[in-house]
Regions:
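Short alpha-helical segments enriched in small residues
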Residues: 2, 6, 12-146
Length: 146
């Protein structure tokens, strides 16, 4: 079975996912890299997300989540990568992406595509949205390797 030799990119969770992963015993054997690319500039500079993608679709979108995770998987030796971008609140929501809207990207090394998912977490509490986002990302990774 594939290891989690992975990379994680988070926007709305601010590092919570890697914090949860590093609580696991033996994590150095499967955890490689974690990036918090909170700003659009860092998404562009570190992950290679195109400015046009962000300007056309927004930082919180399927397209940006996919570009983020494809950038991660191409720049690392990880077997699996996940991206999270969303609106954790309490402000920043829009009609299209209200507070609680989160997009996830997941990619497996040597596959030429990534899957994206959109989730809406109805609790408007920032901490709850972040926690639920991190847990959903863990579930995505687990499902991808089993």
């Amino acid at each position: 079975s594939r290891g989690l030799g992975d990379v994680y990119k988070r926007q709305c969770t601010g590092g919570l996912l890697s914090s949860l992963i590093t609580e696991l015993p033996g994590c150095p054997s499967f955890f490689e890299t974690s990036l918090v690319t909170y700003s659009n500039k860092s998404k562009i500079d570190f992950l290679g997300v195109k400015k046009k993608t962000i300007s056309q679709y927004g930082a919180v979108s399927h397209q940006t989540a996919k570009a983020m995770v494809m950038g991660l998987i191409s720049k690392t030796k990880s077997d699996i990568a996940v991206s999270i971008t969303g609106v954790a609140g309490p402000t920043g929501g829009t009609k299209k992406n209200p507070v609680g809207t989160v997009y996830f990207g997941i990619a497996i090394k040597n596959k030429n595509n990534a899957k994206t998912y959109k989730k809406y977490f109805s609790k408007k509490n920032r901490k709850s949205i972040q926690s639920n986002s991190a847990k959903f990302a863990i579930d995505l990774m687990y499902e991808s390797i089993t």
